[in-house]
Amino acid sequence: MTIRVGIAGATGYTGVELVRLLAQHPEAEVVVAGTESYQGQHLAAVYPHLRERVDLVGREASPEALAGCDVVFTSLPHGLTMALAPAVLAAGGRLIDLGADFRLRDVTAYEQWYRKTHTAPDLMEEAVYGLPELYRERIRGARLVGNPGCYPTACALAAAPLLQAGVVETEGIIFDAKSGVSGAGRGVNLGVHFSEVNENFKAYNIAGTHRHTPEIEQTLSDLAGRPVVVSFTPHLVPMTRGILATGYFTLKAERTTEQLVDLFREFYAGEPFVRVRPAGELPTTKQVWGSNYCDIGLQVDPRTRRVLVISVIDNLVKGAAGQAIQNMNLLFGLPETTGLLNAGPVYP
């Protein structure tokens, strides 16, 4: 049976990436392409790269329009999905939210960081965090999945083997992350104009003010079995796609790079979308461009007894649309690679 898919927010960068990837999915069909800005227009007219690949017309993503969908992806600004979710679930559909409304478990934390009252706190408690490498079995039985943010995906996958094995201290963890400009979305924003970002490089939302901070800490606390606080500094770099996150961890005892590479390989054995590099080799963003892969490399600094872990993803794929489809595959009992293995990487 073909999975009937609805997308609310189909014409933003993340939404159109969902459309692109689902067009090659053998078990799914997009039947509702919801958009506020392009209702009545063919998506291929808005995004010409989709010509001859999709035949979809933008429409309102109303509860009535989405009622016949088996699964709905929401790629909306925070605050909007919480209003739509009850109707989608009541109609028997499943929902995967690529926004922020169902990522955090703590309502108070959500309201503090996003400065909005959460109108569906009961669903917030029900939602499953959609990072398959860590929460796969819970995702399989979910009605509602909070798809992780792009930075939290890269950071969590860099940290998971170390924290679960208990080989690093839980204090003093630092993440220094760089993102391409598409992470800021498609809307008009002076900060991402060509003349502002070209040949430029800047940090933003530093010192614990970025909204992905509590999401990173939530996952790392799960892994460590105790509260974890991190220092997270994001940067904007003049490229279209990609995230490179560097994690700094203090080792509890002396370990070699080779030993920790073995630890990572054992932890991610059988994971179709995590590729651990051999000792002495570090990944680059270009090597995952357009794909659902997370590539990881690491090196021990014996002088400081730290291990540095480099994690790279495509922010629009493993950091958003690809991971959402990976979650959809789990929800419907499909191999989680379905429709994703032909999606890159594109190089150079």
Curated annotation (Swiss-Prot):
Any Gene Ontology biological process: L-arginine biosynthetic process
Subcellular localization(s) per the UniProt record: Cytoplasm
The name this protein goes by in its record: N-acetyl-gamma-glutamyl-phosphate reductase
Keyword Oxidoreductase attached: yes
GO molecular function: N-acetyl-gamma-glutamyl-phosphate reductase activity; NAD binding; NADP+ binding
Gene: argC
PROSITE patterns tied to this protein: ARGC
Record keywords: Amino-acid biosynthesis, Arginine biosynthesis, Cytoplasm, NADP, Oxidoreductase
Organism, scientific name: Symbiobacterium thermophilum (strain DSM 24528 / JCM 14929 / IAM 14863 / T)
Major enzyme class: oxidoreductase
Catalytic activity: N-acetyl-L-glutamate 5-semialdehyde + phosphate + NADP(+) = N-acetyl-L-glutamyl 5-phosphate + NADPH + H(+)
EC numbers on record: 1.2.1.38
Domain of life the protein comes from: Bacteria
Listed SMART domains: Semialdhyde_dh
Active site residues of this protein: C150
